[in-house]
Amino acid sequence: MNLTITSQNNEGYLSIVCKGNIETKEELFNHSQLLFNEIVKYGAKKILVNDIETHLPLELFPYFGLVQEYVENYPPEIKSLMIAIVVAPEYKEVAESWETLCVARGLSFYAFTSLDEASQWLLEMI
């Protein structure tokens, strides 16, 4: 996995920018763990993940396992997070499927293809 992650506090939320390639289920899980580590490090509750320059797997199957991993193996505090992930338009379908799975499991994780829409959503959340 060739991936860089940079983080900074913005007014109202934590901004995480990812760039690189994620090709396998294992790399997808590792990407999520790296993001969660950043969230814990900053103590953030509202997070914008800019994955526009991240190449993601297009198969839907790994995302089922990923969401199950969130619910079963991450700390319960994960349910208090509000995450807006922004992907390139070619990943819109897979990101929307991920969002549907997350929301169905009680997570406030939403997918966008616009940074402006994602940041506006986060700032409007209580």
List where the protein language model places each region:
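Amphipathic, Lys/Arg-enriched alpha-helical "gate/interface" segment within cytosolic domains
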Residues: 1-126
